[in-house]
Amino acid sequence: MYNKEIKEEIIKEYQTKEGDTGSPEVQVALLTYRINYLTEHLKSHKNDHHSRRGLFKMIGKRRNLLNYLSNKDIERYRDLIKRLNIRR
């Protein structure tokens, strides 16, 4: 999974201002990291259905945050999609 240092590094990279941990950009970046990690895990553990369900829930949560961001500020949304290399 990820430790405190990785999480802090992701937050620093995507925060909109100092001390920002709850903006959609930060939340989507953290979810994307976890989704990528779980995707790799499921490649070698094909029958881990509990983790697969968690992955689908995270993807849904990320989708909702991205929809919110695209409705609120389309430029921030496009910038985030480009920075994270998410296809949409």
Swiss-Prot record:
GO cellular component, one term: cytosolic small ribosomal subunit
InterPro entries: Ribosomal_uS15 (IPR000589), Ribosomal_uS15_bac-type (IPR005290), uS15_NS1_RNA-bd_sf (IPR009068)
GO biological process, one term: translation
GO molecular function, one term: structural constituent of ribosome
Pfam families found in the cross-reference section: Ribosomal_S15 (PF00312)
Record's keyword terms, sorted: Ribonucleoprotein, Ribosomal protein, RNA-binding, rRNA-binding
PROSITE patterns: RIBOSOMAL_S15
The keyword rRNA-binding appears for this protein: yes
Role of this protein: One of the primary rRNA binding proteins, it binds directly to 16S rRNA where it helps nucleate assembly of the platform of the 30S subunit by binding and bridging several RNA helices of the 16S rRNA.
Record-linked HAMAP family: Ribosomal_uS15_B (MF_01343_B)
Family as reported in the entry's similarity comment: Belongs to the universal ribosomal protein uS15 family.
Subunit annotation: Part of the 30S ribosomal subunit. Forms a bridge to the 50S subunit in the 70S ribosome, contacting the 23S rRNA.
Protein name: Small ribosomal subunit protein uS15
Species whose genome carries this gene: Finegoldia magna (strain ATCC 29328 / DSM 20472 / WAL 2508) (Peptostreptococcus magnus)
Lineage: Bacteria, Bacillati, Bacillota, Tissierellia, Tissierellales
Gene from which the chain derives: rpsO
